[in-house]
C-alpha cells in the first residue's frame, strides 16, 4: 500500500536530540494472534443490490484443526449480521455473535487430521468501511469497492481475519446485469440469469465467478463492482487488464501502459516469475494512492490522466510499488503487523529500483534521497521507533515513514554490504523458500545468512530492531610535511531513546586533478580517526561516496572545495554543494557557480536548486539567466523560473507570462504563469484570466490558478 508523498529537497537538520512529539512508546504492546485452525478455503457467495446498498451473503468455510479435540471455533464478524450456520450435512450449528466475532459450536470434536466444512449465512446493510457502496457522482459511476486493509475483511465476510493464515478463495457474485464484477484470481465464468426471472419487475442479473486458487491473506481480498470499461492488455500469456470509467478510457491505456514492462522487470529482478493467474488494476474514488490485493490492485482515480499531465503528476512509481507487492506482501506476507516492512519497505525499494532502471542513476538517486528525507522529517518532527515495532493501537499505526522510506534506505545499505549479486540471490531464495507463506523478519535474516554465509544479526539489530539513524560530524586536516590526511568522524546521535552507536562501512572518496581514489573504512566507535598518505592534498573529500548510508552529516568545506564539488561530483554531491554554497552567498564565486549550475547542470533538481539560490541571493542581476531557464526542458525548473519572475511583480514580464501560458506543454507551468500574471498585472488582465479559468486541465490546476490570479488583482 502506498500514499503519494512529497519529495523533500536536501536539508541540513541541525538538531541532534529527537523531538518525540508523538509518544509511540505509550501505545500497547501487541503480539501475534494465536489460532486453533488452518483455514483452507472460503467459498463466498454474494447477492449484491446496489440500489438498496444491501448484501446477502454466505461463506462456506473449509478448515483443518491445528490440534486435536477441536469442538468450537471463532470467526471475525464485524457489522454484518449472521443469520445461520450449517455444517456440510445441512444441520444447524449453534453460535453466538458478540464483540465483533461469531463463536461457533461445531457439535463434534475434530482432530488435526480432519477437515471441517460449514456455511455461514449473513446480511450486510448499508456498509461504509470494509465494503463501500459508492453513489454516482460527476466524477465516478455507481460502484461497490472493498477495502480490507488491514483488518476489514471481517466487515463483509465472516472469516479469520489476520495475516498469519493464508487461504484460497472463491467469489461468486450476483448483480444487476449492467455491472461488471472483479475479484481475485481467475475468472471462472459469467452466467446470465435471465432464465431465473419469474417476475418482470425483477432486474436481469448476472453471476460472476472468480477463483483465487493459490493461498493469500484476507486483507488482500478484493471485490469491485461497477459499470467499468475493461481495457485488455497482456504480458505474453498473462492477462493484464485496466478497469476504468468509460469517460477516461482513452487516457487510461497510456496511464497504465508500462504495467506489463513493470511485471517483467520485477520478475527478472527478483528471480521469481509473476506468481498469479492475471493482474488487474481497478480505479476507485476513495483511494488516495494504491492498495495491493492479490491479482487485483486498487488505485485512486487520479491515476488516469492525459499525456500532458504525466510529466508533473505521473503515478508511475505508485503503479510500480503496487505491482511489487504481488511478490512482497502477496506471495510472501507479514506474519504479524510489526513486520510491516517486509511488505512496504520492499515495495518502496522496488519502486526506487524501477525508477533507476527506467530513468537512470541520477533519477534513482534523487528518488532515494527524497525517501530518506521523508523519514528524517518524521524522525525530527514526530517520533523515532524501530522498524519492527510491537507497540500500536491499530496495525495502520506502523504504516509510516519508518516502514516505507526508512526501510527502503536500510535495504539499500544492506545491498551495498552484501553486494548486488548476493543481495538479489538472497531475495530470490527468500521468495522461493517462503512462497504463499506468512513470514517475519527472522525468516529473512535466516535466508541472508544461508545465502551470503554472513551473520548479519548486527545489521538487523542496529537498523531494524533499534530506532534512529547515524548523525555524524566529519572534520579533516592535512599535514603537508608528512603528506598525511586525517579524517575524524564523531557519531552525535542521541543514544538515550535506544539509538545505537553504529557499526557501519563508509566509502571515502578522494578527488585529485587526474584521478579519484575510494577507500572503505568502518565506523565502530563514537569517535574514529583515519589517516591516509597521498602525494598531494585532495581537491575534495567525499564522505559516503556512493550515497549508501542512512545518515545526517555535517562536513564543512571551503568555498574552493564546494565549487569543485558542484562542478565535478555525482548528482547528490552537486546538489549538496549547491545547498552548502549558501554559507558563502555574499561571494561572487558562489553566485557564479549557481549561475553555471542553473544554466547547464545535467540534472533538473540541481538546476532548480541553483536557480532558487541564485534568485534569493543575487538580486536582480541575473534575471536574464532566469528568463532563459523559463525555457528549460524540465517543467519543474520552468515552474520555478516563472514563479521567481512573477515575484518581481514587473508588468514588463506580462508578455513572457502570456507566451508561456499559451505555449508551454505543462499544466503546472501554465498555472504558474497565470499566478505570475496575477502578481504583476492590473485589472486589464481580468478578461484574459476569466477565459483561462475555463480551460480544462488535470485536477483543474489551470482553472484554480486562474482563480488565484483573479483574487490577487481584486
Identify the meaning behind each predicted range.
Residues 58-79, 169-176, 442, 492-507:
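Surface-exposed beta-strand/loop patches in extracellular or lumenal glycoproteins
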Residues 175, 180, 206, 246, ...:
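Non-catalytic accessory/interaction domains
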Residues 121-194, 199, 203-227, 388:
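Extended, low-hydrophobicity, Ser/Thr/Pro/Gly-biased non-transmembrane segments
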Residues 555-564, 586-599, 619-631, 650-662, ...:
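Amphipathic alpha-helical scaffolding segments comprising HEAT/armadillo-like alpha-solenoid repeats
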Residues 18-56, 138-143, 456-462:
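N-terminal, polar/Ser/Thr-rich
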Residues 2, 17-19, 210, 241-489, ...:
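Hydrophobic alpha-helical and helix-loop surface patches within well-folded domains
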Residues 73, 77-139, 523-537:
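A surface-exposed beta-strand-loop module
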Residues 571-572, 602-605, 620, 635-636, ...:
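Alpha-helix N-cap/helix-start positions at coil->helix boundaries
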